[in-house]
């Protein structure tokens, strides 16, 4: 007779990890394929390198940012245009720091 497992495994951790992986995949796709090259150059690498380290609350902030129009969003990132208070978040600060430390340095070298 076959033993029946009366103690089903708790796979909620696996499901949460899978859901997070899928969420990050959607964020990365949307960040790299914006249709506005300058925004792609900042948000694509940011989503690859930094987004996996963000908390769920920070990912919420990032998703709100990438829902915005490219021209507005890029203007806020480079601080050309005033950023509305609801988008002046810790994630926006991280995006700006990433741009200065990584993207601007590469562009300065002639890449991009």
Locate each region found by the language model.
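Positively charged, polar, low-complexity stretches
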Residues: 2-59, 63-112
């Amino acid at each position: 007779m076959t033993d029946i497992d009366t103690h089903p495994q708790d796979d909620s951790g696996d499901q949460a990890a899978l859901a997070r992986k899928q969420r990050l995949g959607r964020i990365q796709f949307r960040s790299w394929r914006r249709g506005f090259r300058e925004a792609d150059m900042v948000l694509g690498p940011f989503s690859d390198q930094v987004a996996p380290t963000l908390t769920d609350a920070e990912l919420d902030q990032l998703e709100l940012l990438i829902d915005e129009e490219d021209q507005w969003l890029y203007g806020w990132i480079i601080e050309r245009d005033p950023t509305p208070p609801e988008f002046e978040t810790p994630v926006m600060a991280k995006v700006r720091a990433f741009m200065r430390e990584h993207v601007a340095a590469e562009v300065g070298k002639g890449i991009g």
